[in-house]
Design a protein with these regions (language model features):
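Solvent-exposed loop/turn segments at secondary-structure junctions
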Residues: 81-83, 121-126, 148-153, 167-169, ...
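Active-site histidine-acidic residue metal-binding/catalytic motifs
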Residues: 47-134, 138, 157
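Structural recognition of the beta-strand scaffold that forms the well-ordered cores
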Residues: 73-77, 115-119, 142-146, 160-163, ...
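Hydrophobic single-pass membrane-insertion segments
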Residues: 25-41
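Active-site-adjacent mobile loop/cap segments within catalytic or ligand-binding domains
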Residues: 145, 149-152, 195-257
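N-terminal Sec-pathway targeting helices
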Residues: 1-20
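Active-site-adjacent substrate-binding region
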Residues: 174-199
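A short, glycine/acidic-enriched catalytic loop
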Residues: 84-92, 151-180
Length: 257
């Protein structure tokens, strides 16, 4: 075998080795890429019910952790949530506006002895069974249910408060609490009082189940253009919240006499 044949065989062998090396390297790169893809967590798609349950448990856990730090405890329920938008208009959805108002009540509270907890602090749908379970765990002194109205006529405007006679506290009846809350909110927003009424609306039935002072307040009407525009603004929501907080403090004073 001459030198030329030897060199030819050498380069052929070398070429084969390079080809095998390239195949091995490419295979390794593809394998590592596959492993990395497998390690990337896949997006978990939760149902509305699962989202609600998770949010409820987190909120309850945090609330229970802080509950014993306060001498007087209030639970506020921002009505509706999640797929249940409540009343709707061009100015917004009831679920969003009342949640914002309720958060402003918590933010405005400066009394370190008063704890204010929300049944929901996010856009999740809760049923009355969950709300009652939350109340059973927290054991508040006062309950405020916050809604909006939407009448069939655009002339409807103002604040309405609903109460139940199923429970009576000699220091503060639900009728008296309803009157306090309406006066406080109307004063804070310089608005209109539509009166206090015994509860009939289905979405407010929770207040009939409680053995503490409790009312449902509809703090405005989305069917009215002027009031609807105001309810959609943060400054006005803060004024509504101020009125609710003032009412809470007056109710506290009555209960502690």
């Amino acid at each position: 075998m001459n030198l030329k044949q030897i060199l030819k065989g050498f380069f052929v062998t070398l070429g084969i080795l390079f080809l095998l090396a390239a195949i091995i390297v490419s295979g390794y790169v593809l394998y590592r890429s596959y492993i990395k893809r497998q390690q990337i967590p896949k997006e978990v798609i939760l149902t509305e019910q699962e989202k609600t349950q998770i949010a409820y448990e987190e909120n309850l856990s945090l609330s229970l952790k802080n509950r014993d730090s306060y001498d007087f405890v209030v639970v506020i329920n921002p009505a509706h949530g999640g797929l249940d938008a409540g009343k709707e208009s061009t100015y917004g959805k009831e679920k969003d506006i009342v949640l914002s108002v309720c958060k402003q009540v918590v933010a405005a509270n400066t009394d370190s002895k008063v704890g204010i907890f929300l049944t929901r602090d996010d856009d999740v749908a809760m049923d009355d069974e969950m709300r009652l379970a939350f109340l059973e765990q927290i054991q508040p002194d006062l309950f405020i249910d916050v809604h909006l109205n939407k009448a069939d006529t655009a002339n409807s405007v103002g604040t309405t408060v609903y109460y139940s006679t199923a429970y009576y506290n000699r220091k503060l009846s639900n009728v008296e609490l309803a009157d306090i809350m309406e006066r406080s909110v109307v004063s804070a927003i310089e608005g209109f009082a539509c009166g206090i009424f015994e509860v009939e609306r289905e979405e407010m039935q929770i207040i009939k189940e409680l053995s503490i002072p409790a009312v449902s307040i509809a703090c405005g009407d989305l069917s009215n253009d002027k009031e609807g525009q105001l309810l959609a603004t943060l400054p006005y929501q803060k004024n509504v919240a101020k009125g609710i907080l003032n009412g809470i403090m007056k109710a506290k004073d009555s209960l502690e006499k």
